[in-house]
């Protein structure tokens, strides 16, 4: 059972979801004793930095070094401390004098030094004194299970109990498996830490008794462990960290005693039980750091140092180191790979030559394409073509401890990479060397006719990383104290006959070139090619076999460093070399000139060498001095390979049909009837598309809805009484005070209510029923202020309250305001809003059947034209004849308007305008 340590902090994953966090069963420990083993597993075994130009490196995001320290405890053990240190050291050697009086000086500089103190037994947060350890000690600390207690005391991120047999498949130890099994709330991550802990945070730490890491995933040293000398990289690294957690039952005091033993200083020391304790770490590496360098008089090395201190006078501290390789890549904006070096010149009006070097940079253990074109202008002989590579190393250090800089240049190294000679002359003087240029013929002659013609040559020059066991080619560096520069040099040996004598000339063409580490191939610098990992289907819909897709797109024209002939040669055959992510740093090379192919003991090896010799005997590769024995297939990919094919998108490619296209003037209707797969004549409607997608639109039955009515929430007045007093209100308008001008909304005195007495067939769908509030003018403001927002019609005049602008307040959800949608509504009897008469208000044919209460007869429809007096316009088409029991809508509206002070505002404004 796996146990995790988590806190509710910022999450940052340390391992990719597909990688295992634990060591493989067959992994070799860095160091082991009879009681424990130590492993270090890195998420990326190589750290890549970008950019060779010093300007702009600070703007590039730092690279990340992440991994886990695995302490496998075989027997119960007591440890004092567990820590891991990431350290980078630059060293420049300066030998002077001649032996035996030779003196050697060295300039050592620390590039980076960062420590993760995962566990510290002397820390009070990891040990309890005997006086605090009592029978009720379990009640003084938080509730946790037995495994959680191990995590808290050990400071580990993950604890894996020992098993009788190692798991056959480690895939279940990946973070992806953790997420699928719901064993963790987040990805494996560190917990950030700051040197300043707030008061509230200190209380939380005191309650949880959780140790704080420096920049580790689950450290066990408090934040002030480093004091004021906290590394500046610690805080950056802490931003990426968090841990796992689990909660469980509280162990009994007897169980707690199994993990604590008293020591000499009256403290209880935690005992590490058998199992795997995984400590995860993460550290950003700035792009300005130098890459790993190993030269003759200088070096830059990065190492992870693991220190485990044990209790006991006769038990030594366990110390081991793991080297970290840092490689520098060109920046993302670099175009040197795609820029060619082109030289076009005439030599003494005798020969015109064009030289094209396809790239300004080359990867070690790869091939550089170079093309030549020669056009003779006179009788001239070209005996030989040679291609060299030169390397110069420059060292800088402080002179005698002062700030003065001392420079030292190492002798320039010159390596012959390729050579193309003319044919051997038939008559050579005895004792002369046949390999000399003067004993070679003219390579510009036609092989059949023997005439002097234009010639083109194409070479694929192999650039090895190692020539002998002691001579290596170092990539370009960006470090100011150790600089490596490279030049490519092309030499042409020509001769011209003057009379009886022949004079020889040497043309030298030099150009700077960047040499990159072999890991800087396209397989590590370009994004994955998803098209090359499609699952192709045949015409029957069957997927292509995986064996056919394994080598798909293994060659691409953009991958100029690995020619197609080499990719198909046995040096890249899967039967020769096994796929392995851990790429060897050195590749053996075999000298190809003046050496015969030795017989192999094995027939298979002999057959492979014969096939390889045939490949390198081609015109493009025969001139190479060195050839590779084997090349990792991972480096030859034109783009990076997806790390997780399971989580990558699987795209299906359907091949095109072989059937011919239809005629230009074919009948689509007839073709559609005959062919069920043809395009229909009419495009599908919107509802057809939704139906095909399985989406159903909601159906609304309009006949089952009822329109709400507007009613006044005061005592009812008959329309007759309103009619009698309608024009009497005009004389009282001038007597009203102006103190109510701030609240003159005609709609603020209404609310939505239902009329249960009048049937829905007599109600216009757009004109709700109104009833007067019948408020006195003196108490109108006081009563309005006490109205609830949910019972007042939304205001449109002089109202800034947000509660009056919600449509949900108009149609309340209470039983009094709700109306059943199941009631039927006759749409045939609905009339336009401007067509209002007595027949609409009340029908004579069925009035006796639906009106039982005389008060119900006062309900009438309200029209938007009710504010206009019909006497003002002679062209009015409305019928305003009202019986005794009915009131004129205009008079009713005027009374309402008078109570709301609308006309008062109008008259006041009109008088002020006349003045």
UniProtKB/Swiss-Prot annotation:
The modification Phosphoserine is found at residue 220. Ubiquitinated by RSP5. It is found in: Cytoplasm. Residues 182-196 have a biased composition (Polar residues). Disulfide bonds: none annotated. Residues 593-610 have a biased composition (Basic and acidic residues). Pfam families: Arrestin_C. One of its GO terms (molecular function) is protein-macromolecule adaptor activity. The keyword RNA-binding does not apply. Gene3D superfamilies: 2.60.40.640. Residues 182-202, 593-614 are annotated as: Disordered. GO terms for biological process: endocytosis; positive regulation of ubiquitin-dependent endocytosis; regulation of intracellular pH; regulation of intracellular transport; ubiquitin-dependent endocytosis. GO terms for cellular component: cytoplasm; cytosol; early endosome; late endosome. The keyword Transport does not apply. Keywords: Cytoplasm, Phosphoprotein, Ubl conjugation. Interacts with RSP5. Belongs to the ALY1 family. May regulate endocytosis by recruiting RSP5 ubiquitin ligase activity to specific plasma membrane proteins in response to extracellular stimuli. Present with 414 molecules/cell in log phase SD medium. This is Arrestin-related trafficking adapter 6. It comes from Saccharomyces cerevisiae (strain ATCC 204508 / S288c) (Baker's yeast). The gene is ALY1.
């Amino acid at each position: 059972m796996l146990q995790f340590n988590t806190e509710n902090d910022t999450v940052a994953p340390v391992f990719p979801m597909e990688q295992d966090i634990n060591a493989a069963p067959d992994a070799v420990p860095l160091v082991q004793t009879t009681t424990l083993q130590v492993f270090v597993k890195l998420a990326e075994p190589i750290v890549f930095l970008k950019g060779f130009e010093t300007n702009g490196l600070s703007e590039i995001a730092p690279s990340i070094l992440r991994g886990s320290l695995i302490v496998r405890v075989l027997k119960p053990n007591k440890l004092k401390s567990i820590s891991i240190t990431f350290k980078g050291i630059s060293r420049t050697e300066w030998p002077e004098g001649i032996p035996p009086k030779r003196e050697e000086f060295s300039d050592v500089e620390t590039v980076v030094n960062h420590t993760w103190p995962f566990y510290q037994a002397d820390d009070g947060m990891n040990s309890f004194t005997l006086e605090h350890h009592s029978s009720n000690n379990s009640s003084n600390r938080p509730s946790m299970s037995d495994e959680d207690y191990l995590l808290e005391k050990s400071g580990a991120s993950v604890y894996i109990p020992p098993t009788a047999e190692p798991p056959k498949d480690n895939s279940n130890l990946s973070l992806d498996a953790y997420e699928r099994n719901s064993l963790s709330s987040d990805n494996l991550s560190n917990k950030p830490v700051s040197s300043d802990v707030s008061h509230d945070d200190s209380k939380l730490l005191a309650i949880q008794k959780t140790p704080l890491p420096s920049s580790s995933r689950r450290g066990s040293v408090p934040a002030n462990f480093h004091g004021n000398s906290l590394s500046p990289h610690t805080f950056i690294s802490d931003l990426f960290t968090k841990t796992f957690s689990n909660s469980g039952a509280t162990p009994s005091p007897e169980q707690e005693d199994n993990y604590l033993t008293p020591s000499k200083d009256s403290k209880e020391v935690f005992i590490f039980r058998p199992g795997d304790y995984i400590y995860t770490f993460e550290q950003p590496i700035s792009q300005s750091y130098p890459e790993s360098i190993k030269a003759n008089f200088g070096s830059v090395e990065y190492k992870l140092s693991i220190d485990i201190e044990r209790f006991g006078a006769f038990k030594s501290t366990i110390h081991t180191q793991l080297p970290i390789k840092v490689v520098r890549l060109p920046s993302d904006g670099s175009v040197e790979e795609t820029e060619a070096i082109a030289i076009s010149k005439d030599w003494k009006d005798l020969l015109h030559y064009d030289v094209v070097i396809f790239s300004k940079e080359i990867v070690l253990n790869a091939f550089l394409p170079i093309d030549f074109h020669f056009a003779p202008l006179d009788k001239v002989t070209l005996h030989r073509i040679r291609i060299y590579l030169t390397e110069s190393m420059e060292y800088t250090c402080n002179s005698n401890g002062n700030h003065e800089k001392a420079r030292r240049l190492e002798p320039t190294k010159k390596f012959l990479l390729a050579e193309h000679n003319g044919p051997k002359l038939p008559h050579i003087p005895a004792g002369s060397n046949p390999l000399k240029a003067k004993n070679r013929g003219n390579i510009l002659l036609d092989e059949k006719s023997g005439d002097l013609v234009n010639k083109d040559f194409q070479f694929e020059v192999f650039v090895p990383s190692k020539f002998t066991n002691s001579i290596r080619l170092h990539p370009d560096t960006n470090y100011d104290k150790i600089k490596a520069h490279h030049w490519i040099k092309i030499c042409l040996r020509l001769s011209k006959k003057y009379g009886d004598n022949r004079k020889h000339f040497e043309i030298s063409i030099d150009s700077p070139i960047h040499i990159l580490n072999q890991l800087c191939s396209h397989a590590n610098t370009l994004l994955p090619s998803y098209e090359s990992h499609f699952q192709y289907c045949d015409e029957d819909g069957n997927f292509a076999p995986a064996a056919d897709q394994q080598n798909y797109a293994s060659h691409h024209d953009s991958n100029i460093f690995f020619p197609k002939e080499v990719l198909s040669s046995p040096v890249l055959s899967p039967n020769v070399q096994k796929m392995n992510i851990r790429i060897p740093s050195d590749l053996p090379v075999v000298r190809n000139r003046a050496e015969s192919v030795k017989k192999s003991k094995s027939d298979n090896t002999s057959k492979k060498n014969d096939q390889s010799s045939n490949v390198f005997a081609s015109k493009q590769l025969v001139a190479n001095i060195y050839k590779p024995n084997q090349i990792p297939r991972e480096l030859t990919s034109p783009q990076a390979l997806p790390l997780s094919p399971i989580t990558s998108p699987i795209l299906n490619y359907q091949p095109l049909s072989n059937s011919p296209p239809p005629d230009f003037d074919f009948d689509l209707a007839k073709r559609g009837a005959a062919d069920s797969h043809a395009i229909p004549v009419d495009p599908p409607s919107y509802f057809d598309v939704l139906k095909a997608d399985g989406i159903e639109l909601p159906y609304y039955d309009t006949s089952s809805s009822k329109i709400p009515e507007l009613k006044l929430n005061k005592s009812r007045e008959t329309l007759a009484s309103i009619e009698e007093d309608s024009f009497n209100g005009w004389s009282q308008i001038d007597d009203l005070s102006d103190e109510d001008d701030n609240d003159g909304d005609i709609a603020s005195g209404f609310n939505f209510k239902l009329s249960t007495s009048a049937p829905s067939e007599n109600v216009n769908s757009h004109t709700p029923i109104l009833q007067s509030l019948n408020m006195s003018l003196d108490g109108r403001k006081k009563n309005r202020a006490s109205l609830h927002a949910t019972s007042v019609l939304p205001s449109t005049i002089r109202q800034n309250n947000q509660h009056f602008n919600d449509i949900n307040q108009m149609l309340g959800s209470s039983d009094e305001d709700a109306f059943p949608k199941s009631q039927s509504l006759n749409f045939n009897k609905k009339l336009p809003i401007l067509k209002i008469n007595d027949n609409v208000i009340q029908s004579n044919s069925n009035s006796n059947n639906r009106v039982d209460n005389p008060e119900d007869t006062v309900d009438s429809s309200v029209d938007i034209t009710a504010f206009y007096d019909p006497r003002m316009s002679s062209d009015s088409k409305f019928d305003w004849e009202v019986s005794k029991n009915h009131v004129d809508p205009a008079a009713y509206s005027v009374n309402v308007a008078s109570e709301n002070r609308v006309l008062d505002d109008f008259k006041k404004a009109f008088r002020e305008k006349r003045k």
